[in-house]
């Protein structure tokens, strides 16, 4: 057995041992890993889950990573096509399906053969790690359909995003053909998944831009806070009934059970914000910073009275449109901007909705008058159609191609 084979065998032996031994979640956390258990989300209540042991199936009616309770980390990548050969891309999506179901189960993407002169099939940085609730979500842009000659299959709702007021988009963060969103409670697990998927498609796709991010979700019972210190996602829909009304596309074509993802890379001018007094910060949002409650109310989830909010506050302008969306955003920090010497940090805004026009109307209203624009700059943008879920035996995007 080669060194590489011994290295990768450790993970398989460990996982097989745990399955055969039948070690429970809390017992594993205390007896083996030493890590404390944590609450998964509100719906699971007090159920203790061993750190990283929970697996989220890749197969299902809908893709995971959309209405899935948020994980702590994201690795988000947008790809450009290097080929327009439909058969090559079908095979790539089949390969990605095979890899994905293994990755979310915490397995290697492929076992190595006996030739020690070849590179390992899996890059190996997650050997010994658990799945950490990894989800992988795939989508394609309108340009993907055009390049593959599938323009006739483009849904009427799938229109290009218009130019929004005050945005300053940079070409390197705008557009692209394919999106892969990897979310997990361990940053390395998320990165490893994307790394191996791209490695498999290296002759068919190339990376346009990527972004790692994090969410301050704590024990998953509190709304995460953004880098301005305010709760982000309070107004999100949370029930299956609401998901059907807001998130999942009303479609009988290849977008059935899918959703449209709008993404914005937003720089947050932290130094400017940090020089702003508390009252002005709260006026910008229309909520109290500590509790997250809307002005005039006591609790975070109390109904918003628009008449009590400043006319240019973020919450008021978003609520005026009265079109709910599902926000699934992550903060990011990319070191220091060499031009300004300030933090290169902000928000990877991600929203899912059944109709992209929901996002367009909200962003149009915000872009014109939102006081928040004094503290943020939108530099990246994209709109992607995220397929419905994958059936066992099927593959990602099968309904589009067939």
Where are the language model's segments positioned?
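N-terminal secretory signal peptides
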Residues: 1-16
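Short hydrophobic alpha-helical membrane-entry/anchor segments
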Residues: 41-42
């Amino acid at each position: 057995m080669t060194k590489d084979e011994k290295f990768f065998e450790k993970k398989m032996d460990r996982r097989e041992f745990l399955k055969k031994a039948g070690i429970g979640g809390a017992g594993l956390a205390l007896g083996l890993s030493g890590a404390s258990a944590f609450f998964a989300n509100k719906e699971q209540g007090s159920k203790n889950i061993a750190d990283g042991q929970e697996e989220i199936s890749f197969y299902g009616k809908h893709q995971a990573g959309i209405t899935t309770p948020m994980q702590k980390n994201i690795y988000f990548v947008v790809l450009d096509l290097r080929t327009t050969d439909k058969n090559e891309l079908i095979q790539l999506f089949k390969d990605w399906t095979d890899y994905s179901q293994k990755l979310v189960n915490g397995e290697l993407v492929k076992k190595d053969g006996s030739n020690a002169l070849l590179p390992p099939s899996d890059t190996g940085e997650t050997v010994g790690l658990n799945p950490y609730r990894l989800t992988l979500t795939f989508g394609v842009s309108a340009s993907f359909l055009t390049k593959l000659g599938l323009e006739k299959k483009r849904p009427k709702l799938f229109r290009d995003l218009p130019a929004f007021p005050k945005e300053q988009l940079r070409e390197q963060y705008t557009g692209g053909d394919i999106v892969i969103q990897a979310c997990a409670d361990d940053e390395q697990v998320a990165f490893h998944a994307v790394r191996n998927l791209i490695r498999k498609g290296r002759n068919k796709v190339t990376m346009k831009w990527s972004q790692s991010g994090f969410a301050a979700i704590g024990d998953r019972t509190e709304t995460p806070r953004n880098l301005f210190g305010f709760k982000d996602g309070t107004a999100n829909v949370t029930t299956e009934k609401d998901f059907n009304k807001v998130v999942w596309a009303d479609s009988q074509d290849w977008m059935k059970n899918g959703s449209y993802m709008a993404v914005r890379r937003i720089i947050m001018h932290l130094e400017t914000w940090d020089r702003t007094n508390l009252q002005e910060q709260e006026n910008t949002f229309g909520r109290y910073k500590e509790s997250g409650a809307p002005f005039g109310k006591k609790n975070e989830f109390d109904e918003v009275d628009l008449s009590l909010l400043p006319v240019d506050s973020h919450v008021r302008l978003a609520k005026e449109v009265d079109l709910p969306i599902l926000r699934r955003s992550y903060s990011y920090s990319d070191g220091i901007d060499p031009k300004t010497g300030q933090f290169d940090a902000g928000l990877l805004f991600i929203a899912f909705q059944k109709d992209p026009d929901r996002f367009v109307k909200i962003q149009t209203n915000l872009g014109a008058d939102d006081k928040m624009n004094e503290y943020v700059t939108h530099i990246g943008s994209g709109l992607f159609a995220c397929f419905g879920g994958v059936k066992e035996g099927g593959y990602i995007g099968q309904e589009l191609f067939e």
